[in-house]
Amino acid sequence: MMATHWTGLPEEDGDKLKACGAASACEVSKNKDGKDQGEPVSPSEDEPFSWPGPKTVMLKRTSQGFGFTLRHFIVYPPESAIQFSYKDEENGNRGGKQRNRLEPMDTIFVKQVKEGGPAFEAGLCTGDRIIKVNGESVIGKTYSQVIALIQNSDTTLELSVMPKDEDILQVAYSQDAYLKGNEAYSGNARNIPEPPPVCYPWLPSTPSATAQPVETCPPDSLPNKQQTSAPVLTQPGRAYRMEIQVPPSPTDVAKSNTAVCVCNESVRTVIVPSEKVVDLLANRNNPSGPSHRTEEVRYGVNEQASTKAASRTTSPASVPTAHLIHQTTGSRSLEPSGILLKSGNYSGHSEGISSSRSQAVDSPPVSVNHYSANSHQHIDWKNYKTYKEYIDNRRLHIGCRTIQERLDSLRAASQSAADYNQVVPTRTTLQVRRRSTSHDRVPQSVQIRQRSVSQERLEDSVLMKYCPRSASQGALTSPPVSFNNHRTRSWDYIEGQTEATATVNSESQIPDSNGERKQTYKWSGFTEQDDRRGIHERPRQQEMHKPFRGSNLTVAPVVNSDNRRLVGRGVGPVSQFKKIPPDLRPPHSNRNFPTTTGVSLQRGIAQDRSPLVKVRSNSLKVPPPPVSKPSFSQHSLASMKDQRPVNHLHQHSVLSQQTQFRSESTFEHQLETEVSSCLPGTSAKTSPQLSENLGTSDLELPAIPRNGDINLQEAEIQQPDVLDNKESVILREKPQSGRQTPQPLRHQSYILAVNDQETGSDTTCWLPNDARREVHIKRMEERKASSTSPPGDSLASIPFIDEPTSPSIDHEIAHIPASAVISASTAHVPSIATVPPSLTTSAPLIRRQLSHDQESVGPPSLDGQHSSKTERSKSYDEGLDDYREDAKLSFKHVSSLKGIKITDSQKSSEDSGSRKGSSSEVFSDAAREGWLQFRPLVTDKGKRVGGSIRPWKQMYVVLRGHSLYLYKDRREQTTPSEEEQPISVNACLIDISYSETKRRNVFRLTTSDCECLFQAEDRDDMLSWIKTIQESSNLNEEDTGVTNRDLISRRIKEYNSLLSKTEQLPKTPRQSLSIRQTLLGAKSEPKTQSPHSPKEESERKLLSKDDTSPPKDKGTWRRGIPSIVRKTFEKKPAATGTFGVRLDDCPPAHTNRYIPLIVDICCKLVEERGLEYTGIYRVPGNNAAISSMQEELNKGMADIDIQDDKWRDLNVISSLLKSFFRKLPEPLFTNDKYADFIEANRKEDPLDRLRTLKRLIHDLPEHHFETLKFLSAHLKTVAENSEKNKMEPRNLAIVFGPTLVRTSEDNMTHMVTHMPDQYKIVETLIQHHDWFFTEEGAEEPLTAVQEENTVDSQPVPNIDHLLTNIGRTGVLPGDVSDSATSDSAKSKGSWGSGKDQYSRELLVSSIFAAASRKRKKPKEKAQPSSSEDELDSVFFKKENTEQSHSEIKEESKRESETSGSKQRVVVAKESNTKKDSGTTKEEKKIPWEEPPPPHSSKRNRSPTLSCRLAMLKEGPRSLLTQKPHCEETGSDSGTLLSTSSQASLLRSSTKKSTSPETKHSEFLSIAGTTTSDYSTTSSTTYLTSLDSSRLSPEVQSVAESKGDEADDERSELVSEGRPVETDSESEFPVFPTTLTSDRLFRGKFQEVARVSRRNSEGSEASCTEGSLTPSLDSRRQQFSSHRLIECDTLSRKKSARFKSDSGSPGDTRTEKETPALAKMFDVMKKGKSTGSLLTPSRSESEKQEATWKTKIADRLKLRPRAPADDMFGVGNQKPTAETAKRKNIKRRHTLGGHRDATEISVLSFWKAHEQSADKESELSAVNRLKPKCSAQDLSISDWLARERVRTSASDLSRGEGLEPQAESPSVLGTPISTHSPPSQQPEARVAATSTLASTSQSPLFTPPQSPDQINRESFQNMSQNASSTANIHPHKQSESPDTKAETPP
């Protein structure tokens, strides 16, 4: 609407006089300058400033410039309109005058005046329209030229300005002109984007005669506003008056083209809509404007400059928004305005026309093209000092002045336009619709166009314009440019609905006051421009339509001359309009299919664009527009915008057009019925239609395309003459024959203008216009008051627009006009043209149709198809049938869209005319009403519900038209109960119900959107209701037939399916409902039935499940969902259809033949309804339903009925999609590429990895590539809504990774080892979808963070290890769980077997996942609740875990450094023993947190560890922070794994709690587990490193021996009962976890305890160090993987397994990690400032190192409690078992190294603590007793223990030196209890025992630090370490959810 949208400086050019006004009447401007608006001049000749006189101001340039900014406010006609103009030329429309090309109405006005600036001093005011710059008229100049003139002016700038009140565009689009727009453009004029090509020169070429109705004095004011406005106004004034003058009319048209925006604005200015226009403009600018732009772009069929068109469209869209409202009142005005536009007054024309129109109506066709003295007055802009006066005198003033005034004017103008009759009412109606349309399409263009369309309907030309208007609506601005005459009308809609009104008014008014004039204008003007106006103007309108629609929908083009345009959503109507001769036109009005088709197309287009249809209806029914105008304008604008984009869609254009076509036909029919009285109603109906279209456009479009095409073709064929007339007013043509009737009169009036029909007819039209105006005003008032007279209007104005739950749906729906829907419903496309007459004939039906259409719009114009069948039910069904026949798949696809649901809502409201706002008003004439017992059989989700679910309710039922309203109270009639929105009985099936209920006198009502039971008091009452409802449902014969057939066929299918499914009846209703829902988009209870509602979806899901299976199976299904899912997946339907078939053999999607239809449908459905559905794709669907759907789909996709209830269950749909990919014989990532993908994913370099993946993806077969691209985009869309659906890319990757990235053969090894890769690949694909599927030249993706999370967290080495372990998949499930450990022992690096076993475990665990998790949770909960130790453990866990990790890491590092390969070997064996692996894991985790242990830093790698630990602190923490998310994410997908793992962990942790040693080993294993969570390899490596380095040679030997005994740790664990550590272990409590834990912990742990005590700081530190470095790296790499896996149960299991397995790989990793640990320690040293925790941790760790240095016995002494022994694994075999369980549990929590990161951070803290411990040793015991941090809990026992530890640590550090220190870190890495002094450890042990996870962890970590420090100072660290401990100790983690939560990175 505003140039701002497309113009670079729409709002302001900049501080430098940015002329932000639209150069609306460039040519007019010339006229304005030199000519009197009153004097007839060619548009170019007329000075836009012929108005009483522009004010001249002299500005002196200053350094600040001239002190004002300009705004170029442009109401652009769509490029399609411009093309229409060309078409007009081609069709002989006055030689295709350029003026006919809708030129953007623009106004360059002063946006701001800087106070104190030259402009301010000169008196320049905001809103002053620039008419001349330095004496040079701006008319015909581009904004940049104007700016250049200003900028190039000398020191003095002479500006001729027109007051704001005189600027039509500003007046009409006051809000848009000021509220919307781009920021001030402060650049050179040359840089100012030029608006879309404006045919200003063309305007001048327009015959002056028409434009000359120089009464454009007021237009002058407009021209002042709009540069061309003045001329336009002048001409418009004349044109308005001269609207009667046919020749001037062409000129006006030219001007109209120029002044399109102006006209639009004028219309708005003149008409009440201006206020709404402003509002709408604001709306439109935001949504509508862009929408217009979008639409124009989408429809940019004829958009010469898509961008410019969009700009114009946007600008016009803004204008039309207001314009729609304006149109409502200014509909008639618009017609005169159209004349004015033709006159060539661009700006002035709009406003003038609006004004003139009113005046024209009021005044006789005196001097200028005005119909009446008012017209004369209007014409005489000069007579008024201000446009305001002019308007005031003109009465359109109400509409022209302020928006409020215009709104008032709309009402008044409707009446006043009653003078105009057709014009104003039409315009009002059009404005309402138009506003929506213009809002959607091109603000002004659309609005004007709507007006024009209305007018065109009112008048033949107007009807043509109506179609163009529709086009305008579609591509509001551009279309006006297209036609000259038609364009004028279109411009009337677009640039000035005023113009359209003027044109129509001319036509309409001509019959009234200037019947002759109208003919003169339309006929006279068109007489000379008869072809031009009838043919030329109509073509022009068509062209306009085309541009508008072409831009938006290409509707105009479609309407104009070819079905292709119709396909574009405008061609058909355009051609009809263009070619409709007067002769043909009457036939059209007589239901000539050609004519009807033309109108229908136009309307379809309008409806497609919503406004267009509305416009059409509006023209026919003026009264409705007022009501519908406000409501529809806003909603329509919103929905129109959406619609417009939808319209841009391929099918939608055609569908919408077709639907609109039909709707228009139907509307025409109805309108004809109510020509005079229903003309306003028609407008209202049109508005509803528009609104409805908005609602249903999306669906309708798909359905419409084929039907629409047929309709267009037939229409075109039938109306070749119509093409000649080029009149979009096929409806009007009908009025030719039916001119006697008010609507026919209006039609005739339009026809007269177009076909040069006799003035008498025009007069007749005029009378209808007057009557219509009165009716329109009344109806507007009624509508505003929720009146019932124009149901369509009310609905369009309020309900339909409001009803669409989702804008997108509305947009889509809007695309399919109600009439188009009706047309579609109309079995005969050709009869679409005929149908409009029918529509006209049955105005009330039209209302319903409108409401119905709007609702139907969602279902691709199914309801709309049957215009007469206003209810969506019938028309929808019929349309559905037609669509099925014509575009079945497409339609179904559309129906699958959300729009369908909206359609339902709209449908519901359709019947009520204005169900929400004016249900009672609309249907005040209730056919029947009374109290009935009501019970819905089908929920909003389309699911059948039992009586208990939906009890009977007593409702006051009111049957109005096709709507059945249910009220809880008779007094609530105005407000239908929320649950019972109006039920559309159109084409409903009603019968006596015997089976649904035992009650008597119950009849069942089945509609397209609902199924319900009603119980009457007695049989007679029931039969009476049935009869009444049947009659109401058959109001539209055509629709009813189709709909009933559809319902019946659906019912039959449903019954058949139900018979097979046992739930026959319920399912049938549900199915029908679902069908209706899908097609219509909503149930009869649209509110409750939001397709996007997750709850509804879930309910629907449940219902659908019930549907698919007998209700008795519900419990079974629920209980057996997992088994069912497996069965479903196992059950592979015959590969005859969709599932189990190669991608290239699958039925292709309609949009992309390389994408399977099922994928397209499922994704679309999910995107439509499931984006906000929590857990979409995660929550499985009903297996029975999935299997059933698979079978059906395999039978044939052609039978897919997305409306079926089973398609309502998002979970089923999502599961269906997953099942499809799972069943693909050739995986999406093909078998031959699978290995490459896995390998690529493991690349170290993130960019290289991504590039390789991209290359591989692009190397996929085309079907696979396209499907993957589509699916990735879909998943990305889903992930983008992760805040609501909780499905982040990681979660989606977990869900889809194994499904997409797999091999045809189910290889457990691959499943296990490659799962992280699969997750990662899919996650990466989702995250970088845009990059992956762009051209090679695309910039590199941002992989730093992502790669760190995904690639780093999942290092290739880990994968390799997993692969190697995979070779050892022969392990039992329990072994599998342990196999990670044993495998790592065996293949020390081959994590594959562990993963294989893990995968097996996953299989088992998946079965027991829920149970395991549940058990795990209770255990975790129970364990933490041990005692104060529990609290300590909570903090100590974190702190101690970190500390112990730090020690372990340091020790591991030292050991790694010292032992290196030796440790590797040992670790290999140790890894065999779970203790070692656990230790390794702990150490690995600790390395991340190693910085804290000062001992370790003192020792071999103490510095390194410090640095690394510091780094780990920071890095690991972040990782941990990340990990928790991953873990959480993975928790869903990894539920099975985590469940089983956790279960085993619980077992082990239970045992672990018994023995501290077990805890220690568990801790280690946990660390390993954590590490291995996502990247199993990493975890295993960590474990190995940690174990080997951490464990002393003895321990290692023990581990080796144990490894020998149990070749696989898992075997040993299994034998020991420790399988819990592995994922399987958790799943398989069978393994004596206690035994395993005891043995491992006793043997290994004792050794470890000794070695750890000796080497806890040394060997363990070295191990930790060694493992730490790699573990850090790998962990970092693994984090994302871990997160992913953690999300996945399998991942958790894997991590658990890997944790166990990591023992052996840990050795290898120790070396690898050694550097990392060293780095970490260095980092720790550098970044020791982990916090006070680190300092205490280090000092404590030093003390603890001393303690560890002390002999184990000494340490045990220090820790006299049994827990200390347990920690060491000395005498706590039982605890060891428990500990093992806990370890396993914890490991599950830790999965994927979540805890590793935490532990690493803890280790960092521990280092710091150890260092501080050294210092602390110097502190007094009391000081030490004091908590180092507030987080630290002061425990006397802990303090004593720490003191002991400190003392022992000091001794140890002195005695053992670095070795003990290293040991201490190792100890830190190992369970703290093992390392902590005996005294402390017992305490810790107690805590651990009591809290298992919490206490154990805290004590475990406490030892590395002095007990005091660990417990006190380290408490913070422990709290931090608790997470790390939790990470390290899976069982502990399981034990303590807190720890788990903390643990996740």
Curated annotation (Swiss-Prot):
Residues 347-358, 1377-1395, 1531-1556, 1569-1589, 1887-1896 have a biased composition (Low complexity). The modification Phosphothreonine is found at T741, T1504, T1669, T1902. The modification Phosphoserine is found at residues 42, 63, 454, 610, 619, 851, 856, 875, 918, 920, 948, 1093, 1109, 1412, 1426-1427, 1656, 1729, 1906. InterPro entries: PDZ (IPR001478), PDZ_6 (IPR041489), PDZ_sf (IPR036034), PH-like_dom_sf (IPR011993), PH_domain (IPR001849), Rho_GTPase_activation_prot (IPR008936), RhoGAP_dom (IPR000198). Residues 1782-1792 have a biased composition (Basic residues). It is found in: Golgi apparatus membrane; Cell junction; Cytoplasmic vesicle membrane; Cytoplasm, Cytoskeleton. This is Rho GTPase-activating protein 21. The gene is Arhgap21.
